[in-house]
Amino acid sequence: VHAHDWLAAPAMGWIRQGRGRKSIFTIHSTEYGRCGNNNYGGNSERIRHLEWWGCYESDAVIAVSHTLKNEVQWLYSVPDWKAGVIYNGIDYRHFDGWIEPAGVKRMYGVGPMDPTVLFVGRMVHQKGPDLLVSAIPYILQHCPNAKFVFAGDGESRWQTQEQAVHMGVSHACRFLGHVNGWRLKDLFKATDCVCVPSRNEPFGIVILEAWSAGKPVVATSVGGPSEIVWHEINGLKIDPDPESIAWGIGTLFEDFDDARWMGRNGRIAAEAVFSWDIIADEVLAVYNSI
């Protein structure tokens, strides 16, 4: 039985009970991390208990990054022999196909020659959209026609939009809410770089999506991205603070040829390291080991 995250932990235990089944528990993030590295009470405490229970009951625990593995071991006392790491994967072929970037940009009120930054993810404190907005004034000083597209929804969306208005940068921002399917893939392919400014990031699937679309990333050095991003090869690592984010984006916008080269390297990484065929073989190896 292979369960993913706390929601599936009770089902894993029920199927396993009295049947002699081996079980594996994969954790993609922790409640502690999703709460901004805080241990809250109430429902959050119940979720943490299910995470602990899944780790305790299973024969093997898989984390999606070494950083997350260390966090899980610290939180739930998982022994080394039981814990391992398998990165997330992606079907990079889903991002193949030609588009007209200028046409996609026009759909969102962005000029065809405007340097464009894409943020994709939940609009919550953990993911740091407010940090990107705080970086925009620095970037506009050197690249006044830059645009920043936010694709995602969440509890911080309206607060982040108000922040953009308060800082006088709303004219450079496009808040699209939840976007999926071909519209999201086209956004990845039309942008110039993808920013991942998270305060806590167990892995960062968005990075693999950006690379599959051939785009460089400006990604936090906190958590999983610090392991998978090769600095100045397929993106830039930054600290989760506005000045560092501005430096990363500004560096890419200073040399678009170099930025495109990083994006091509990202595509190579998606194909050679993170394809589902490779990840599936690693999971099968765990199945055969228990």
Feature map (PLM): residue ranges:
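Nucleotide-sugar donor phosphate/pyrophosphate-binding loop at the beta->alpha transition
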Residues: 22, 32-53
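A short helix/loop element that forms part of the nucleotide-sugar donor recognition site in Leloir-type
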Residues: 42, 96-110
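Carbohydrate-associated surface elements
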Residues: 67, 89
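Conserved donor-binding/catalytic core segment of Leloir-type glycosyltransferases
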Residues: 111-127, 133-136
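Short alpha-helical donor nucleotide-sugar binding micro-motif in glycosyltransferases
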Residues: 178-179, 186-191
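Aromatic "clamp/platform" in nucleotide-sugar-dependent glycosyltransferases that forms part
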Residues: 199
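Short hydrophobic beta-strand element within catalytic cores of glycosyltransferases
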Residues: 207, 216-219, 229
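Conserved acidic donor-binding segment of nucleotide-sugar-dependent glycosyltransferases
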Residues: 231-232, 236-242, 251-256
